[in-house]
Amino acid sequence: MPREVRERQMMDAAVATFGQQGYRAASMDEIAELAGVSKPLVYLYLNSKEELFTACIRREADALLAAVRDGVVEPGLAPDQRLWAGLTAFFAHTAQHPDAWSVLHRQARTHGEKFAAEVAGMREELVSFVTGLLREAARTTPASPDLADLGDRDVVGVAQALVGAAEAMAGWANETPDVTAKEAASTLMNFAWTGLGGLLDGERWPAGNSPVPRR
């Protein structure tokens, strides 16, 4: 069997085991058995449990990022449709690969700084991608000021909020029966785009420029 095929089988088995049992509880024996190979062969290919887990994080992070980017490649989409397409692709991927999402969203973030840093890199790329979508929305919305006028921190802050909300909703959607990717994306769009649309039209929350009222 070609090396890349055997390695993919081992990685698939590792993602399933790590995702369902957690990093600490998962054993190399179980991973080898699920992959249909010997444990020495797993070590030969991927050296240690830590390196295997790191490889799983990187592979699944790359796959998620690719799914989101591929979701918005259709030319001529309006800004809201591009964001909708990206969110739908995000939720579809996390729903279709629940073990991978568990590895990225739960296991990697709670089992050491090295693993958390790998996921943080993926998140930074997502935030950067969403930031680009927001800037594009500003440029193509005639009534709005350029979002750059708000300052980089404001734009990135909105992108951070959207990514964080999407991450939280993916966990909820995967644990709630019968929630589809389109339903999850629609819920987030209904929440986010109404407010974002006002921002693009130059509207601001008035209380943001005045003292918080006391009760």
Region annotations inferred by a language model:
Residues 1-5, 138-150, 200-215:
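N-terminal intrinsically disordered/low-complexity leader segments
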Residues 55, 70-99, 143, 152, ...:
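Hydrophobic alpha-helical connector segments
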Residues 51, 85, 92-131, 148-154, ...:
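Short secondary-structure transition hinges
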Residues 9, 13, 17-51, 55:
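Helix-turn-helix
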Residues 92-96, 100, 132, 159-179, ...:
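Amphipathic C-terminal alpha-helical segment
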Residues 62-66, 113-142, 156-160, 183-197:
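Amphipathic alpha-helical packing segments from all-alpha helical-bundle domains
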Residues 53-60, 67, 104:
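Alpha-helical DNA-contacting segments of helix-turn-helix folds
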